[in-house]
Amino acid sequence: MRVRRSLPWLSLIALGLAVAPVRSAADEEDDAAEVRYRVRTDAALERMTVEVCFAGAPPRSLGPGIDRAGPALLDARKGAQALTVRRGRIDTSGLSDGDCLTYRVDLDQARRASRFSNRQGVDFVGSQGAWLWRSRRRPPEHATIRFDLPDGLRVAAPWPREGDGYRLNRSAFRRPAFVAFGRFEPIRVSSHGVDAELVRLGDGWDFTAEDTTAWLRTAIEGVSTVQGRFPVSNLLIVFAPGDGSGVGFGMVRRGGGCSVGFIVGRHSSADALRESWVTWHELSHLQLPPMVQEDAWLYEGLATYYQEVLQARMGVQSPEQAWAALRDGFRRGARGRERDALAVEAENMHRTYAYQRVYWAGTAFALEADVALRQRGSSLDEALRRGARTWRGGPGVWRSERLTALLDRSFDAPVLGPLRDTYARRVAFPPTAELLERLGVGRGGRLRAAPLESVRDAIMSR
């Protein structure tokens, strides 16, 4: 049986979108000690008015989290006094301690500045960086945001609740999140240690809210088989409609909390939802903390590995199908052009398009690591379960050296660190045929008796 899995970026390119973080130039501003935001919109969600109050000294200027959102700024005022605006930045140098200002944003223009934005009638989703102005060099350490919306409108955001609003940490100003506004009815599930909220943009979905809830519960249950609980405590998921059937594309964002945007066929069946591998890939990213781009081989590889493993564990596909998908992926990864060390390829993959090699070499690492740990009486599941106690909910971006050093602490001798070093420096695609032979995985995923068949079977078991 020939099994192919397209990588998420292929669906993204087909939709005319682009994967990229929020990028902005640093300036020389200082941050305020505490900032309070109050957000209002009109009923059509065409205009947004934001009041910003500073508990301490204001910064010298405020700007958007996304540079190209600057033209969306309509005006800014302190009371009746107009404030100077230059290239989308608000001059706040004349404000005093404890002052407030108000600015207005054209939401359609802001949405167009936000990558992976989508509007369906009134409902829309985009990055907060397109409408949340802040000090850009040093964002506030403590901030809250409150939404006062017209009747019938809702906001869905991934940030921790505080009173009648949300609490924003610095990552909410430094990284994008998916934030949705509209007339949707949220679907909420609390299970396996996570409070999850899901919203669907627009009308005309063929699958029901009950189908969506079942999909979400199954996904949470499956992902939780790795660490014994869901890897994060709060999660926002946004469904934007697309063509085709099932989940066609997904993206994880971690600005102030974890959010995932999915493009889903509006006319999908419940079975098509359940059988979409993109679900498992994107949610598996949450098993790890945020990591630097040069380690994309590790975090994309681990997500690709678990997308197959978790489907087998949940009965979405058979173990034979999962092994066939992995074997086929290794073959495609090995066909990629070998230019540089894997870590270098990962850092440059959006420029060189070396996605197949980066993803599948990282998947080979995950498989080899899992097998090595299981031979020692542990597993990759167990290593992640222990490591997550350190990074869950914490700030900062990790490097693979630090990550593997943490995971190796429970072993008599380092296992993952040396393997990580070998893979990061490797130019040639890793040899996988011998390992698959020892696991008893043949062509088409056919399984046979082999020295490591017990390890093979345990990987796909719950």
Task: Describe each region flagged by the PLM.
Residues I187-D295, Y306:
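Juxtacatalytic substrate-recognition/specificity segment
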Residues L74, G129, P140-A156, R167-R174, ...:
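Zn2+-dependent metallopeptidase catalytic core
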Residues D27-C53, R392-R462:
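Beta/coil-rich, acidic/histidine-enriched accessory regions frequently appended to metallopeptidases
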Residues E294-A364, D370, R385, R389-G394:
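Acidic/His/Gly-enriched intrinsically disordered linker/tail segments
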Residues W9-A18:
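Bacterial N-terminal signal peptides
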Residues A55, R104-E185:
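Extended, low-hydrophobicity, Ser/Thr/Pro/Gly-biased non-transmembrane segments
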Residues A57-R87, H142-R161:
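Solvent-exposed beta-hairpin/edge-strand motifs
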Residues R40-D42, R68-R119:
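A surface-exposed beta-strand-loop module
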